[in-house]
Every structure is written in structure tokens, then in C-alpha cells.
Amino acid sequence: MPAPRARVVLLAGPSGSGKSYVARRSGLPILSLDDFYKDTGDPTLPRLDGAVDWDSPAAWDAAAAVRVICELSADGTADVPVYDISRDRHVGHRTVSVLSGTVFIAEGIFAAEIVAGCSTRGVLADALCLRRWPVVTFVRRLLRDLREGRKPPAVLIRRGLRLWRTERAVVRRQCALGARPGSRRQVERRLRELAAAGQESRSA
């Protein structure tokens, strides 16, 4: 198997922990794993209390995410779906490109689910889990979701309280799947190290 042109950093963490913010600050190319949610109406979607459980990994297409990551790693470019969370469906596609010899970030709440798949295929640079105090995550998530109009306010509050109660278990699961836990500063430092290593590789 030829060496990949680029490798992926999987950035996991609870919803609202700041993954997208940290990824943007890194300056590295970003693949949003939220774009691999399944469309509403998919018969395989999991349900909780009579509604779709969007916080279950079964609501997400892990195979498609790994396929696109491998394509980006091998070819430097990939056609990526665009998902509208407020409408629970895909609304288009976009092209993502990365430079040869670099790393790129794939971030999302289910990133840890594909650590093994990416590692087996030789495209994994690192897997990190961003963790914060649950109360901070709760406030960040609620303000973001209300601002973006992702769901009706009552739904967001109920979901937020449920995720608050389960956040520590979510982090434990992500770490058990192979993601290394760290604070925002620790994760940002590791991303800088990986970015610098990529620059050295390109200039060598």
C-alpha cells in the first residue's frame, strides 16, 4: 500500500466542547464529521423516547466518513457531503483539499468511532478527545444550538440536560476507543506539533 499523501487527526469530544473552534484556530484543513449524519427517514436511524437519537453513533455513517478520509489522504482532494442539521438531511456537496505531506483534522462527536478504521488503513496521525467541565459544555452547546436554530428550544434544553448527565461516560467511551484526552490548551499544543512536523516534511 503506498504511503498516504496526508494523514488525519481525529478530534473527538462531547457536543459543545469546542472542537470546531479549536480546529479552526489550528489553521489546518478541516473535515466536519457532522456532514456524515444519516438523512431523516433512513430506516436504520436509532430512536429514543419516540424520536430519532441523533447522539447515537448509529445515526452516523462511519463507513462513508472513513471512505472520504482515505480518499483525502490518498488523493489530496475529495467530494464531501454537506448536511443541514436544522433539516436533518444532506443538501449538497463540496470539495475539500489538503496539501501533500500535511495533516488535516476530522472533527465531530463520533470521531473516536473511526480511530480503529483509520489506524488500520494507515492514515491516522493522532486521535484526541477535547474535554471540559460538563457545565461549561452544557452552556456552550445550548447557546450555539439556540443561535443556529438547530432544533426547537424545548428540544435543545431537554437534550442538553441529558447530555450533561452522560458527558463523563461519553468521554470515557471515546478514550476507550483510542482518543487521547486533553484540555483545550493541550489539544491545541498537539495540533501545533503535528502542523510543524508536516511543514518540515514538505520542506525536506
Please place each PLM-identified region on the residue numbering.
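Hydrophobic anchor at the beta1->P-loop junction of P-loop NTPases
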Residues: L11
